[in-house]
Amino acid sequence: MTIEQVKDYLRVDGDDDDNIIRTMMEASKEYIVSAVGEYDETDKTANLLFCAIVQNMYDNRELMQSDIQQRKAIEYTFRSIILQLQMKKAIKGDT
């Protein structure tokens, strides 16, 4: 995904945060590769997870302990999508 696509997802205007968004994009890709084994940029589910991870990083640059419930919900969502991607990869490997 391009930085412009990610900024559209984040609803970010301007270029002030481009460097930090690029860093978050790299970290998001590494996160997905570590969890699934690959990041298929043609997979819409993978792209959704990619953007959701970047958004989580961007929105929570200063995580607070009082937001534990919200973080747990986000982590559950990520795990659910990661499991779906792992299953897709396993199915592709069997064909």
Q: Where do the protein language model's features map onto the residues?
A:
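Divalent metal-cofactor coordination and adjacent catalytic microenvironments
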Residues: M1-T95
